[in-house]
Structure formats: structure tokens, C-alpha cells
Amino acid sequence: MAGGEPQSLEEAFAARRNVLAARRARERLRRLIASKSRHRFLRYLSWRFWKFERRDYWRKPKGNDNKMRLQLKGYPPIVKVGYRTPKAIRGMHPSGLEPVIVSSAKDLERLSPERHIVYIASGVGLRKKQEIRRAALERGFRVAN
């Protein structure tokens, strides 16, 4: 038999079960990523002043009597540790794959298409970018950019 083929029927079934288990695990991850709501933390008084509203970045309220800092009812939530993304899905692509930045076609050799999604580095030129994209698609990788 060839090198990659299973020796018996039991091994074939075991290999199939492993593939299905991995697929189910990735589906669970994908659902967990989708269900994780992303809070949009507002800057204090951004609902009142247009100049704060259009600047969409977080600033911690620090005033002595600031109602938002005191977490009073009717004021938006402030950034806290409890809002952090679960460790299992932190930094993952919404597809459930782990993102990897690639700067040459050689980098693809150490990666697995079942686990990784490819981002081509921003410093790569057009010709090399096309070469990396072609190599990635031949090996079955998904290219995100």
C-alpha cells in the first residue's frame, strides 16, 4: 500500500472519526466566535457632543463625580476584565482558523490548511504576492487579504 493509505478498515474508520471530530470542534469554535458580542464602549459625553461621537475611541472617565466612572444606572458600561474574549477564541479568525502572516511561499510549508488562514504581509510586492497566493491556493489554504 501507499504511504498515506490506512492498513485496515478499522484504521480507515478511526481516521474518518478524527476528521469528523476536528470538523465538529471547529464548528463549535465558529459558533462561539459568532455568539461573542462585541461591546462598543462609549467615551463619556459622546452621546451629547458631536466632536466626541465621531472620534470613536475609548477614554477612561476619571472625574471625581463622574457618573459613568461610578457605574450608575443609565450610563454606558466601562471597560472591565470581564468583557475579555475567551482564551479559546482570542485572536482567531471568524471562520475558526488561526490567522498567520506570511511573507514568502516557503512559510506555507510549516502550516496546515485545516488549522490556519493566511494573511499576506503588507511589505510584500505584487509579483511575490501573486506567487504566494498561487502557492497557498494550490495547497488548499484560505487567503484572507
Curated annotation (Swiss-Prot):
<dbReference type="GO" id="GO:0003735">
    <property type="term" value="F:structural constituent of ribosome"/>
</dbReference>
<comment type="similarity">
    <text>Belongs to the eukaryotic ribosomal protein eL32 family.</text>
</comment>
<dbReference type="GO" id="GO:0006412">
    <property type="term" value="P:translation"/>
</dbReference>
<dbReference type="Pfam" id="PF01655">
    <property type="entry name" value="Ribosomal_L32e"/>
</dbReference>
<dbReference type="InterPro" id="IPR023654">
    <property type="entry name" value="Ribosomal_eL32_arc"/>
</dbReference>
<dbReference type="InterPro" id="IPR018263">
    <property type="entry name" value="Ribosomal_eL32_CS"/>
</dbReference>
<keyword id="KW-0687">Ribonucleoprotein</keyword>
<protein>
    <recommendedName>
        <fullName>Large ribosomal subunit protein eL32</fullName>
    </recommendedName>
</protein>
<dbReference type="InterPro" id="IPR036351">
    <property type="entry name" value="Ribosomal_eL32_sf"/>
</dbReference>
<dbReference type="GO" id="GO:0022625">
    <property type="term" value="C:cytosolic large ribosomal subunit"/>
</dbReference>
<dbReference type="InterPro" id="IPR001515">
    <property type="entry name" value="Ribosomal_eL32"/>
</dbReference>
<keyword id="KW-0689">Ribosomal protein</keyword>
